[in-house]
């Protein structure tokens, strides 16, 4: 009897659920900003009178189950609330307009967590995709110049395809990395393939590019700049210098949409060095301090450069329904640098597919491929840089003669050699010889594959898992003809480098958001891992002396094959091959408590385990972050002309990870198979750098959100800097590492903006940014009476 009753009760319950389900159907659509004609991220969509609802995704899309008689309520901070009856519709698209009585925007913060801007306890600035696309560049990040206080972007002088140096609030590390972390859709990306920084002064270190140049600007929906350590603390050691959060576009449900864009920009040198034009060439044919010229020498530098241009072409397709959405884009870039024969080409393919599984589970897959081809990219130093010869060309000499006849035949060598005022010196040479006989060629491929799954367990609780794999490949060939670099390579040089980089990243996040009467709680906890691998294969050979066949050097000049380099491995090198692997495991948590939407308290914590510290006393390091903000306008009647009057403060301690192979002995294999012992002592007590950051600020908007003002004061101290110093003679080693030093940055940032909406189709906005940073080295290594000398090939810097 009990079984029959149970079966009957289950049957009735099933019929009830089925009947209830039959009364609802899937409703989807897109919510956009009517004024900007852009999707709204994080807009709330609720069934009126219930707690059932959802939020729009990165492209303004939403999907939920609703009945025919239900009313959907669309709300978004700073927008007027809209109510739409379902009435049997399956697609409801909404255009929202500004509400001058409210304020705020949704900001994508660390780990991809979305928050209302007015709740943040630190400085964060958002830039729309349109701002990046107004004036496109080969490197997308260059389009952000001047758009944020406290951010300095310096494109390298290596020409088209080169990287850019990005600084938030000054240099913090003397020996380590100062670049901010780049994050795409919540996941950190590899900054460059070669893992090199362009800082060589003499040896001509090349530019390995960066991840920003592989991003199609038309794929960008939003960029958030997290300039302080507190803002990026959840990313841990890799984000001690801040983070650039890039949110890309996804597919929208509905009919297929196609977007096509093409633009061309031109550039030319704005400022050139001033040259003396009174004295001619010196006796050695190198400098310009010889006899006084009878007439003023012309400015040859102006004749060297050309007008550069960059053309960007892009097409994207998106579409789908409530169950599956897809987005595809293709872009190509062709650029001619201002240096002759410096050309850049790239192709970018990007695809994203999203699936709504059941009611509460969403899955995304992404795939991306980028190919870059660069010719005649100048080196960072002056050894292989044609600009050195342009700027130091002896005054009064025949520029056109060296341009048209950059090489002459040398019967002794049986080949053409460089024609220059002094072919024996190494500092600089004929720039046209370099452009035609020392051509560096770079080919890069970058592959990215990723996926994520999110389960909305309840309207307040969700769990999300993400994973991304990246692979970078680079092939760099630089063959120099005989007589290059003066007497350094009289018979030429062959160089063939291949770099490979792999990064695997994964994380799991659990998020909870709930409002309890006057209180609100937003919390996220999770774990992540990052595994990187970099390898390098270098084949090179040099003709460093005039040789006869069989002498152990080059056989025929200007034939760049390994077989042309004779005998021993000192002339054909394979010993510059290496591989590094690194792993970083982390756990983290963050929580924000709000009171009456006017007081907010933040706390974050993270612990990292780095394989670079595996041989030290502890490979683990912990750091916290705290913050608070008060919106006085929520508690004090300030009149209709004050929309937001907010004060904020935050404090954090964030680590900066160290390079590999510092805590253990590193043996290398020589070209003859011999094992080479290390020349540096293992650093068993190595500690990561720690950045202590304090930030205090004010945010205000006035006159119905027309006027906005932001002011921030900050102070950072980065301690535990790591240095290489001379080891005691009796140790048998050359150097040892030490933790020491304190680098301080303090300053303020100020920005003011005005926005005016004249009509539905015409608006005007302007912004002014100003920042000041005082960068000082407060402490260095103790017990070094002669100071600390940091050396690079051909350069030394003494710091006291």
List where the protein language model places each region.
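Short, small/polar-rich motifs associated with maturation and membrane association
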Residues: 2-9, 15-350, 355-358, 362-364, ...
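Structured core elements
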Residues: 107, 126, 152, 167, ...
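Extracellular/periplasmic, surface-exposed regions of secreted and cell-surface proteins
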Residues: 179, 290, 308-311, 346-347, ...
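Short small-residue beta-strand/loop micro-motif enriched in glycine and branched aliphatics
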Residues: 191, 327, 335-338, 488, ...
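Low-complexity intrinsically disordered tracts that form flexible linkers/tails across taxa
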Residues: 193, 374-393, 780-784
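Acidic, glycine-rich flexible loop segments
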Residues: 310-311, 382-433, 437
């Amino acid at each position: 009897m009990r079984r029959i009753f149970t079966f009957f009760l289950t049957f009735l319950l099933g019929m009830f659920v089925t009947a209830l389900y039959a009364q609802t159907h899937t409703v989807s659509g897109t919510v956009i900003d009517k004024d900007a004609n852009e999707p709204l991220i994080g807009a709330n969509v609720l069934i009126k009178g219930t707690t059932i609802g959802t939020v729009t995704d990165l492209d303004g899309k939403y999907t939920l189950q609703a009945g025919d008689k239900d009313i959907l309520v669309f709300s978004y901070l700073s927008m007027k609330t809209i109510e739409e009856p379902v009435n049997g519709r399956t697609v409801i698209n909404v255009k929202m307009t500004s509400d001058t009585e409210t304020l705020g925007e949704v900001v994508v913060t660390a780990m991809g967590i979305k928050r209302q801007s007015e709740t943040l306890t630190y400085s964060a600035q958002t830039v729309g995709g349109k701002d990046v696309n107004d004036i496109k560049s080969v490197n997308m990040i260059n389009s952000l110049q001047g758009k944020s206080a406290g951010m300095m972007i310096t494109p390298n002088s290596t020409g088209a395809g080169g990287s850019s140096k990005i600084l938030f609030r000054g240099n913090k590390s003397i020996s380590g990395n100062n670049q901010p972390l780049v994050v795409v859709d919540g996941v950190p990306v590899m900054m460059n393939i070669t893992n090199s920084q362009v800082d060589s002064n003499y040896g001509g270190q090349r530019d390995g590019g960066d991840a920003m140049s592989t991003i199609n600007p038309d794929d960008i929906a939003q960029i958030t700049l997290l300039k302080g350590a507190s803002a990026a603390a959840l990313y841990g050691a890799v984000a001690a210098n801040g983070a650039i959060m890039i949110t890309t576009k996804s597919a929208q449900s509905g009919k297929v949409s196609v977007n096509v864009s093409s633009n061309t920009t031109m550039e030319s040198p704005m400022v050139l060095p001033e040259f003396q034009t009174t004295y001619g060439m010196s006796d050695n044919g190198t400098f310009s301090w010889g006899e006084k010229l009878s007439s003023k020498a012309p400015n040859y530098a102006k004749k060297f450069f050309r007008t550069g241009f960059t053309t960007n072409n892009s097409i994207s397709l998106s579409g789908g329904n409530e169950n599956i959405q897809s987005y595809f884009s293709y872009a190509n870039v062709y650029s001619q640098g201002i240096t002759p024969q410096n050309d850049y080409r790239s192709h970018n393919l990007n695809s994203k597919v999203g699936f709504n599984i059941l009611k509460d589970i969403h899955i995304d897959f992404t795939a991306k491929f980028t190919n870059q081809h660069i010719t005649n990219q100048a080196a960072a130093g002056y050894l292989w840089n044609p600009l050195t010869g342009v700027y130091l060309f002896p005054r009064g000499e025949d520029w056109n003669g060296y341009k048209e006849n950059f090489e002459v035949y040398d019967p002794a060598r049986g080949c053409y050699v460089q024609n220059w005022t002094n072919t024996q010196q190494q500092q600089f040479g004929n720039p046209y010889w370099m452009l035609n006989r020392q051509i560096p060629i770079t080919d890069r491929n970058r592959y990215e594959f990723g996926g994520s799954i999110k389960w909305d367990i309840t309207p307040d609780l969700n769990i999300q898992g993400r994973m991304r794999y990246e692979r970078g490949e680079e092939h760099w060939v630089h063959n120099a003809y005989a007589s290059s670099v003066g007497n350094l390579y009289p018979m030429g040089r062959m160089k063939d480098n291949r770099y490979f980089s792999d990064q695997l990243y994964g994380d799991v996040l659990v998020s909870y958001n709930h409002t309890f009467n006057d209180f609100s709680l937003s919390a996220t906890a999770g774990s992540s891992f990052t595994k990187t691998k970099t390898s390098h294969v270098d084949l090179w050979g040099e003709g460093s002396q005039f040789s006869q066949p069989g002498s152990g050097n080059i056989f025929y000049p200007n034939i760049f094959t390994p077989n042309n380099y004779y005998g021993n491995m000192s002339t054909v090198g394979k010993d510059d091959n290496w591989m590094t692997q690194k792993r970083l495991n982390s756990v983290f948590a963050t929580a924000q408590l709000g009171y009456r939407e006017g007081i907010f308290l933040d706390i974050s914590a993270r612990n990292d385990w780095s394989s670079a510290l595996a041989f030290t006393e502890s490979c683990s390091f912990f750091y916290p972050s705290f913050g608070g903000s008060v919106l006085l306008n929520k508690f004090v009647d300030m009149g209709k002309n004050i929309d937001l009057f907010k004060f904020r403060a935050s404090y954090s301690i964030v680590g900066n990870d160290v390079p590999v192979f510092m805590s253990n002995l590193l043996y290398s294999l020589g070209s003859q198979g011999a094992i080479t012992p290390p020349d540096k002592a293992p650093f068993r007590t190595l500690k990561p750098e720690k950045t202590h950051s304090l930030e205090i600020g004010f945010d205000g908007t006035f006159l119905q959100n027309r006027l906005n003002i932001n002011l921030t004061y900050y102070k950072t101290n980065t301690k535990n800097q790591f240095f290489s110093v001379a080891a005691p003679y009796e140790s048998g080693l050359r150097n040892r590492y030490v933790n020491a030093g304190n680098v301080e940055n303090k300053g303020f940032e100020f920005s003011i903006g005005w926005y005016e909406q004249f009509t539905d189709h015409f608006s005007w906005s302007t912004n002014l940014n100003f920042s000041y940073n005082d960068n000082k080295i407060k402490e260095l290594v103790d017990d070094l009476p002669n100071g600390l000398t940091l050396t690079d090939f051909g350069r030394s810097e003494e710091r006291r």
